[in-house]
Amino acid sequence: MKRSKYFGTDGIRGRVGLSPITPDFILKLGWAAGKVLSNYGSGRSKQVIIGKDTRISGYMLESALEAGLAASGLSAALTGPMPTPAIAYLTRTFRAEAGIVISASHNPFYDNGIKFFSIKGTKLDTQVEYFIETELNKCLKCIQPKLLGKAKRIIDAAGRYIEFCKGTFPAHLSLKKLRIVVDCANGATYHIAPNVLRELGADVIAISCNPNGININNKCGSTDIRRLRTQVLLKKADLGIAYDGDGDRVIMVDHIGNKVDGDQMLYILAKEYLYQRKLHGGIVGTWMSNMGLALALRELNIPFVRANVGDRSVLLMLREKGWYIGGENSGHIVLLDKTTTGDGIIVALQILSTMVSNSVSLYELCNNVYLLPQILINVYCSGFINPLESSVVKKEIQIIKQELSDQGRILLRQSGTEPYIRVMVEGKHYSKISYLANRIVSVIKGEMRSVN
């Protein structure tokens, strides 16, 4: 199958006002998706769940999607601002034909995107995405007036999802003795995560929970934990929890301000599942996963494999192997025994239940996993030229790999969601890998200048 024109690793994403994130394109996308999804759902409900994060552009894109779906004969059930995993859950429980999320995840407010979920609450198969793109190449033709779709609001969508999240936390446990700072990135979890934690008994200090349409992910959330760390120390909290704009990622901070990333959380979950005799097989990470995670899991005799970067790749490998737990160091973690996609709130609850049931701190849970220093630099790269194909860049990479030998790793890749080249260097000594990473960046930038 040829490469997708519009769909990336996580749906369709881009700058609002520029193709493809324009109201006219999104309207036609709704129509094309409606025509295809009606054939891949149950065919009975004729309903699609639509959720969004808190970006100001969400109103415009929601209306466009709604119109396009109606023109195809499908009705829209609107949730308002809701975490991405909540839409996956609601799609299943409402037996909808599909779920659609309007979000650009951890990106700034001026970006937005569209993600699709199947009737089972899973990411759409790439073949279905291809069929949608095929329909997009056709002229929009409205269905007969009497068959047009409608639109309605789902009553208490947030309450339904809150109860689902709480249901994944052991009924005999409570968070009453914990003080937790929660940073919702001014995003879709702002009215969900604090309430989940409070209803389970925690003393909650909520920050970045006042979205205004343009402050989503702005110096807050899982991509910038400086304010969270400050508040944890200032309020003498037991830990801090940070979500990204659409709630499918989570990063934590222990009581002394140490960052706890996705790799450390994977280790905590793997060890607890092993102890509870619930671990099926092993753990799926990605090529970005720290070598320290692999070594720590080896000590526990837990198998560890690496998938390509992206939750879709992690999910595919989990299903292929029949395993439950996988994720990325960015905090995007999947627990297939709990839900069908990455869910930051549910992952955090499993970490909290491990703390409470074992009467240990988050700091103590991380004691036996030692992450190697890792440098990640994003190099802006617009246009169609891929500097990673340059012979000059390839030669420099080979030289640096020889310098690192078996004492570290290098990973270079193009982002599937943003116009960046990701440069990752990992090794035992921070000063050395920082020097090597910046050498690579200099060569990449030099090649882009020479091409331009």
Curated annotation (Swiss-Prot):
Q: Name one GO biological process term.
A: UDP-N-acetylglucosamine biosynthetic process
Q: Which reaction does it catalyse?
A: alpha-D-glucosamine 1-phosphate = D-glucosamine 6-phosphate
Spell out the molecular function terms from Gene Ontology: magnesium ion binding; phosphoglucosamine mutase activity; phosphomannomutase activity
Q: Name one GO cellular component term.
A: cytosol
InterPro entries per the record? Answer: A-D-PHexomutase_a/b/a-I (IPR005844), A-D-PHexomutase_a/b/a-I/II/III (IPR016055), A-D-PHexomutase_a/b/a-II (IPR005845), A-D-PHexomutase_a/b/a-III (IPR005846), A-D-PHexomutase_C (IPR005843), A-D-PHexomutase_C_sf (IPR036900), A-D-PHexomutase_CS (IPR016066), Alpha-D-phosphohexomutase_SF (IPR005841)
How is the polypeptide modified once translated? Activated by phosphorylation.
Question: Needs which cofactor?
Answer: Mg(2+)
Q: Which residues form the active site?
A: 105 (phosphoserine intermediate)
The residues listed in the UniProt record as binding Mg(2+), with positions renumbered to this chain, are 105, 244, 246, 248
Which domain of life, per UniProt? Bacteria
Keywords of this protein's UniProt record, alphabetized? Isomerase, Magnesium, Metal-binding, Phosphoprotein
Sites of the modification Phosphoserine?
A: 105
Q: What is its EC number?
A: 5.4.2.10
Cofactor binding note from Swiss-Prot or TrEMBL: Binds 1 Mg(2+) ion per subunit.
Task performed by this protein: Catalyzes the conversion of glucosamine-6-phosphate to glucosamine-1-phosphate.
Q: Family per UniProt?
A: Belongs to the phosphohexose mutase family.
What name does UniProt use for this protein? Phosphoglucosamine mutase
| Species this protein is from | Blochmanniella floridana
